[in-house]
Amino acid sequence: MNPEILQQDAKLAELVRRLVESYRPDRLYLFGSRGRQEAKPDSDYDLLMVLAELDAPAYRIAQHAHRLVWGLEISADILVWSRDEFDRRVEVKASLPATILREGMLLHAA
């Protein structure tokens, strides 16, 4: 996990707190330019939330999760995957999960 980035970025820390409180994810990753620590001041936040089970389609959960960004004055994309799907796809080197594990940051683990 990378608690240092959460200490340096109060808005990200608040978004992580909101997501963890609302969804209790298995894991929460930061990826993209911010995950690689190549972000510019106006870069968005790319987050992947891994849930034990999906109780609705992933896109619906992501739409609802995106509402938690409100009031933080940041731009964020939140993806949602089930634990099984993430773990299955991580074996494929060119997949998003594999890329996130290589280049991203783990922000939360249950």
Label each region the model flagged.
Residues 46-50:
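Short beta-strand->loop micro-motif that forms the acidic, two-metal-ion catalytic signature
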